[in-house]
Amino acid sequence: SNGGENADGFAIKLHSGIGNILENCVADNNSDDGYDCYAAHGAITFKRCQANYNGNCYGIKGDGNGFKLGGVDNKTSGVKPHLDPLNHVLTNCSAKGNTGSGFDRNNQNGVVTMTNCTGDSNKKYNYNWPAKGKPSALGYEVTFGRAKIVNSTSINGKNNISGADLIGKCNG
């Protein structure tokens, strides 16, 4: 058993197709992540999506990120570990009350743009966007492309945004 891992609300991961657009989607109360883009192969567009209270479903616990926006693929048999730099776009999205981070880089090395987004009361960070990653399955520390956080808000939580540029009116 893997606890609550991989019980995501929306799993656009592990070699998913390109051109995925999610609009007006809600991912609430999943034991793992609300939206998981681990090892996706194409940039994903999110419009007006919500991720709330993920990471603990009736005591079954996973990572608990609202939007997990990257990751290295080192688990697929026959596929060499790799990081795909993907330029995901999130517009008018919100993440509230997740046990992990609301918006989590998870080793995404593309330039992700988050516009008019809100992180509220997420346990780890509202925005978790460090400049560098831990040594990965590839065996080296990853230096990332910088995220763009545009006209966005952080409420009742902390942020790790050394790998992001704040543009326009950002609060919190």
Regions found by a protein language model. Give the residues of each.
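Extracellular beta-strand/beta-solenoid scaffold signature
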Residues: 1-15, 29-38, 59-81, 97-106, ...
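All-beta strand scaffolds that present successive hydrophobic residues in beta-strands
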Residues: 19-23, 43-49, 76, 85-93, ...
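Gram-negative outer-membrane beta-barrel proteins
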Residues: 55-57
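A compositionally biased, intrinsically disordered/low-complexity signal enriched
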Residues: 25, 35, 43, 89, ...
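Low-complexity, intrinsically disordered or weakly predicted helical/coil tracts enriched
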Residues: 18-19, 52, 102
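Residues on the solvent-exposed faces and adjacent turns
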Residues: 14, 24, 29, 39, ...
